[in-house]
Structure formats: C-alpha cells, structure tokens
C-alpha cells in the first residue's frame, strides 16, 4: 500500500448488495476486498434481505450492516428522511468512519448516507454506475431531484467511463474537476475460457441480460430470425428474465426456432461462466450503458463480442479483435453477427486463451482499488464546508427543490443534535477505544 495514503475507515453504502446479484453488488464486494488488502478498514451498509438482518461477516471477512429499512421498489429503500438518521449515525460512530462512499443513482440509502454523513462533517464520495437521458420524465426527475441536489455537497464523484462522466456532469450541473473516471473490473479468475468447447461446439451466440426494453430485447426479437434464416446451423442461448421474455417466446414459436434458440430464464451469477463457455460469440443489444460488465465477462471467457455502439461501450474493449460495434439498428447488427460467424467458421477469431490473458491485464480489481484510494485522499484533503455553507449550496441550485432539501437538512441537523445530547460522540469514541484495546489484548494473548 502507498504509505502516503490512509489507512482510512470507509463505509460503502448502497441498497444493492449480496445476496442480491448484479453489477453494483459485484463492484462493492470486490472493491471492499481489495481496499481491505490495501490496509483500509471497510464496512458495507445496506438494507436487510429477508432473514439476513443485523451484522454479518462474509466469508472474506467483510463486515456488513443489514439495516431494517423498508424496501419500496426494485430493491431500493423508501427514503424516510429522519428514520435512517439514528441507524446511520450509530454505525458511522461505532466504526469510526472517515469516508462514506455511496453507490448507484437509484439507491435512496446511498443518498441519505451521503447527506447525513456530510452534515456530520464526514468526507463523502459517490460512484455513478448509470447513464441517463435528458428528455423523458424519469430522467428529468432523477437529474433534478437526485443528482443536482444530492451530489452538490459530495467531496468527490467517480464515473465508470468518460461518456458516463460527461453525462453525470451535465445531468447534475457539477464541477468537472471533482468528477473522476475509474472503470469497472471483473474477477477474471472466475471467467476463464474452455478451449475445447470453443472449438468443438456448433456456432453459438450467447445473450445474457435482463429482458427489458433498455437492454434491447426488441432488437433481439428482430435479429434472431434474420440470422437463423441466413445461417442454418447457428444456435442462440438467451439467459435472463423480464417483461420482454414473452415477446421472445412468441418469436421463437412463430419462426419454429425451439431447437435453435434456448431460453434459460433467470441465471445465478455462479452459472454465467458455464453458459458463456458454450458459445463463441456474445451479443449485446443495450440501448444505453455506462459500462457493460457482461461484455468484459464474455471477452474474458474468450468470446467475440458484437454490440451496439452506445454510451461508454466503445471505451471498454479494443474494436475488431475483441468487439464489433454497430448502431442499434437490426439490419446492421445482423450483418455484424454474420461476419463474426463467418470469422468463427474460418478459424479467424482470436485465440480464447490469449483474449483472456489480455482482458486480465486490462481489468483487475487491485488497480481499481488503488485508483479509488487516490480519490479518497482527494476527498479527505478537500475542505469540509460548514452546515450553513451546505444549506446555501442547496438554495443556489434553485429555490423549488432547494427549499425541500434545506428543510430536510435542518430536520437532520436537529435530529443529530438531539442524538448527540443523549449519546455523545465523545462517549462513543471512548467505547470504540476500549473495544479496540480489548481486541488487541485478545490477539496478543493468542
């Protein structure tokens, strides 16, 4: 570890974490592990999942707080304004947290933690994993109500691609100097190629993702029949579930493709490699992406990727050898797929083992963690504004939602004052010192 950085006590906060599976969940898990390896103290704060409540230690030693918050929609908690203050304050004090790192625009818990932590004069960092538009109602509400106000008082912001950075700066009207770009990574040891299947299996195209409009499920419905009509032996494997699955089932029925299009449904993450190893080509039809983890996983397994040219995807993999990019137009994607199939059958695709080795060098979690700790250092070194200064920033963003955020901030300030009166931070610090001393003595006796 760079001795000039930290060590810091860090709380990674998001509604999305294990046992749930997804890009944000994976990112937090591996980032936490690598930060611990670098010498930092890390805890994760999320909401309870079924019977998983309270404090849990994962197999890698990571401490996780599963707090009893109400889940409102799609895994995100219902913002309660004052209800989360006692819980988050207690965890921040108990763990001597210096830096709060929130993840995901969609996580109400992350935004609450950033606001409460900021008013406690703790340092704050936010990672935006999403890419939004500017015109539709949901994007306007997210940009105005969440990003413009929630991030105005955050010390440092991380985006997963340069396209995502530009998008976030514009959406949130942020100072570009406090927004950095650090790409995602994958645990390449979990995504290794199977050369025997790659060469012996019939030509197989794999799609893994949620079957929703945003992921281009409508494009899939048009692409598959056209490719199957022009190439009589190609197979498709589709892993994932969602509202568009019915349309894909109808397409398969209409064109009598039951034996050539396999629908796997929802796929546990530990089975992703097994499915990828059955194919040689991976198709991604997303209409918008900040950084597409699935195409990196596919490339790590040795597959050639055919993808839409949207968002931050052109930054992810080298074009031609690793990925073929086309606009999200059915005929263009069909043409790209047919060219990839021709390359596969003539033995002109890159060797899967060499591709895996190259991806391993491009994307690894230790590198992401080292770059992230530099952002933490910037956050710690940046001046922490007073509570009055924070309220002024909300007001300057616009009087409408500004008054709403000022009101919420004042309620939180009063709530913190009452809690500090009955449970002083100094008393908590003494308890933490005694607890640390007890652990040290126990370790010495052993």
Describe the role of every protein-language-model region.
Residues 48, 163, 185:
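Carbohydrate-associated surface elements
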Residues 158, 197-225, 237:
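Conserved donor-binding/catalytic core segment of Leloir-type glycosyltransferases
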Residues 249-267:
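Nucleotide-activated donor-binding/catalytic signature segment of Leloir-type glycosyltransferases, i.e.
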Residues 266-267, 274-279:
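Short alpha-helical donor nucleotide-sugar binding micro-motif in glycosyltransferases
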Residues 287:
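Aromatic "clamp/platform" in nucleotide-sugar-dependent glycosyltransferases that forms part
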Residues 304-307:
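Short hydrophobic beta-strand element within catalytic cores of glycosyltransferases
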Residues 348-405:
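A charged, aromatic-enriched C-terminal amphipathic alpha-helix characteristic of glycosyltransferases
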């Amino acid at each position: 570890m760079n001795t000039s950085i930290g060590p810091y006590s860090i709380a990674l906060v998001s509604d999305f974490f294990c046992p749930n599976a997804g890009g944000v969940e994976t990112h937090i898990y591996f980032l936490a592990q690598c930060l611990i390896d670098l010498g930092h103290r890390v805890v994760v704060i999320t909401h309870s999942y079924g019977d998983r409540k309270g404090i849990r230690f994962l197999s890698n030693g990571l401490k996780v707080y599963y707090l009893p918050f109400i889940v409102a929609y799609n895994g995100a908690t219902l913002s309660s304004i004052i209800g989360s203050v006692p819980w988050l304050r207690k965890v921040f004090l108990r763990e001597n947290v210096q830096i709060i790192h929130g993840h995901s625009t969609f996580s109400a818990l992350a935004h609450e933690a950033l606001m409460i932590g900021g008013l406690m004069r703790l340092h704050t960092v936010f990672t935006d994993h999403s890419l939004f538009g500017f015109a539709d109602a949901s994007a306007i509400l997210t940009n105005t109500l969440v990003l413009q106000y929630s991030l105005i008082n955050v010390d440092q912001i991380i985006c997963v691609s340069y396209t995502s950075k530009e998008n976030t700066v514009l959406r949130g009207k942020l100072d570009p100097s406090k927004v950095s770009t650090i790409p995602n990574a994958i645990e390449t040891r979990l995504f290794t190629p199977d050369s025997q299947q790659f060469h012996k299996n019939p030509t197989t195209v794999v799609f893994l993702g949620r079957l929703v409009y945003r992921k281009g499920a409508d494009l899939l419905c048009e692409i598959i029949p056209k490719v199957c009509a022009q190439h009589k032996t190609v197979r498709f494997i589709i892993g994932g579930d969602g509202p568009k699955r019915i349309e894909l089932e109808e397409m398969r029925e209409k064109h009598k493709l039951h034996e050539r299009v396999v629908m796997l449904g929802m796929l546990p993450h530990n089975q992703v490699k097994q499915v990828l190893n059955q194919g040689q080509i991976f198709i991604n039809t997303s209409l918008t992406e900040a950084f597409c983890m699935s195409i990196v996983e596919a490339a790590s397994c040795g597959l050639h990727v055919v993808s839409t040219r949207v968002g931050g995807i052109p930054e992810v993999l080298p074009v031609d050898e690793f990925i073929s990019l086309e606009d999200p137009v059915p005929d263009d994607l069909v043409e790209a797929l047919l060219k990839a199939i021709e390359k596969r059958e003539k033995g002109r695709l890159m060797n899967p083992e060499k591709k895996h080795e190259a991806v391993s060098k491009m994307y690894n979690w230790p590198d992401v963690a080292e770059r992230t700790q530099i952002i933490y250092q910037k956050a710690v070194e940046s001046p922490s504004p007073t509570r009055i200064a924070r309220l002024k920033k909300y007001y300057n963003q616009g009087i409408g939602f500004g008054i709403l955020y000022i009101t919420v901030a004042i309620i939180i300030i009063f709530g913190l004052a009452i809690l500090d009166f009955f449970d002083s931070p100094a008393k908590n610090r003494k308890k933490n010192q005694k607890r640390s001393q007890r652990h040290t003595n126990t370790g010495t006796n052993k």
